[in-house]
Regions:
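Short active-site oxyanion
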Residues: 64, 88-89, 143-148, 199-203, ...
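Short linear loop/turn motifs
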Residues: 201-210, 310-313
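Short, function-defining helix-loop hinge/capping sites that tune catalysis or transport
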Residues: 15, 53, 77-78, 87, ...
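Short, acidic/turn-prone active-site loops that include or flank metal/cofactor-
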Residues: 30, 35, 90-97, 247-249
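Active-site core segments that coordinate phosphate-bearing ligands/cofactors
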Residues: 3-6, 98, 105-117, 124-167, ...
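Short beta-strand-loop/turn "lid" adjacent to the catalytic site in phosphate-handling enzymes
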Residues: 58, 62-92, 117-126, 155, ...
């Protein structure tokens, strides 16, 4: 038996093929463009992601089953009839809805959101992004009026286009702030609060099941990438935990059959997976910019100064080589890093990275309890 594991992530799409003997090999990995039309906005082209997924499927060869891991909170709109995108994929890092989130918080809405979804009010989650799409994009409003609007996270669009199935799994739905965590269904009050038409959202399913076929091959699992990592690392018992270091860094700890709410520490209640209708819960703590926070040297490599660095000597220019040695901040990196903090998720500016050439600090960091 050969199984293709598709991982559609924030910066790349890859496919790993696992065989019955336990061997596993990455067959193909493809990077995609990051779009920043305004400061704090982060978008992907859904058609580029879909094309990369299809190329990965072709590279996997003949397999017996397919699994799909997705970005989680990244979301979009599309036409139910044509399948064409009506919006870009708004990435989880995107913070365009922060003013709206602040207004909701000032109105006292956070208590309801935390109680129902397990998540705090934050632009990170899908709810406010989907509401923004409905409010600001004319194509989405026209589709809504015509009864053709579909809204969802990236997995729902991939499943719709690849399998003809308009569905999402419960782990992904739990990251939207629109799902009632205890009941595993879309919450009408939360949808109304964020301005998201509940009838436009996908069916919520178990993590493992029949999601349709791609060609003649069944897609039998769909899950958020971080939860996939938790399961893949063999975590099964309450207290088992893992930390994944990628674009962001995310810690997940299993809590088993119990939903553990710990708002005073900033840890979020979520679902790790659900099989045969039985949910397994977890606690989540995340840092939005981990490897993303140190990608700026790659950008600097494009500068004339960087191109002229003598590679053979290993020398680096001093800060005097730069027009200003004062630290600056990348205007496209205002997503910030978030981490569990004693009274919620706190945000404080990070000092410039200490390198011999220190032109900017890409990320923000958070004060965590000691």
């Amino acid at each position: 038996m050969r199984i293709a594991a598709l991982d559609q992530g924030t910066t790349s799409t890859r496919v790993l093929v696992a065989s019955q003997d336990g061997s596993a090999d990455i067959q193909l990995a493809l990077r995609h463009q990051q779009h920043h039309p305004q400061s704090g906005w982060v978008e992907h082209d859904p058609l580029e992601l879909l094309a990369n997924l299809q190329r990965c499927l072709e590279a996997s060869g003949r397999v017996d089953a397919i699994g799909l891991a997705n970005q989680g909170e990244s979301c979009m709109a599309w036409d139910a009839r044509s399948g064409e995108p009506l919006s870009p994929l708004i990435v989880w890092q995107d913070n365009r809805t922060t003013p709206h989130i602040e207004r909701l918080r000032a109105s006292g809405a956070e208590a309801l959101v935390v109680e129902r979804s397990g998540l705090p009010l934050d632009a990170y989650f899908s709810a406010s992004k989907l509401g923004w799409i409905v409010e600001h994009l004319p194509a989405a409003r026209r589709a809504l009026k015509a009864g053709r609007l579909r809204l969802g996270t990236s997995d729902a669009w991939f499943l719709d286009r690849l399998c003809g199935t308009f569905a999402t799994d419960v782990t992904t739905a739990s990251r939207t702030a629109l799902m009632n965590l205890a009941e595993g269904r879309w919450d009408p009050e939360l949808c109304a609060l964020f301005g998201v038409p509940i009838e436009c959202l996908p069916e919520i399913r178990d993590t493992v099941g029949h999601f349709g076929v791609i060609g003649n091959t069944p897609l039998t699992a769909s899950v958020v990438d971080q939860q996939a990592s938790l399961y893949g690392h063999g975590c099964r018992q309450p207290g088992d935990a893992k930390i994944t270091f990628g674009t962001g860094a995310f810690a997940l700890t299993l809590s088993g059959e119990r939903i553990i709410r710990s708002p005073e520490t900033g840890l979020l209640a979520t679902i790790a997976w659900q099989i045969d209708g039985k949910p397994v819960y977890a606690m989540d703590g995340g840092v939005y910019d981990a490897s993303a926070a140190v990608e700026w040297p790659g950008v600097l490599a494009c500068s004339a100064t960087s191109r002229n660095w003598p590679a053979s000597t290993g020398r680096r220019p001093s800060t005097a080589a730069w027009p200003s040695s004062r630290p600056c901040r990348d205007s496209h990196a205002r997503t910030g890093t978030a981490a569990p903090a004693r009274c919620g998720w706190e945000w404080t500016p990070a000092p410039a990275a200490r390198t011999s050439a220190r032109p900017c600090s890409k990320a923000w960091c958070c004060a965590a309890p000691r």
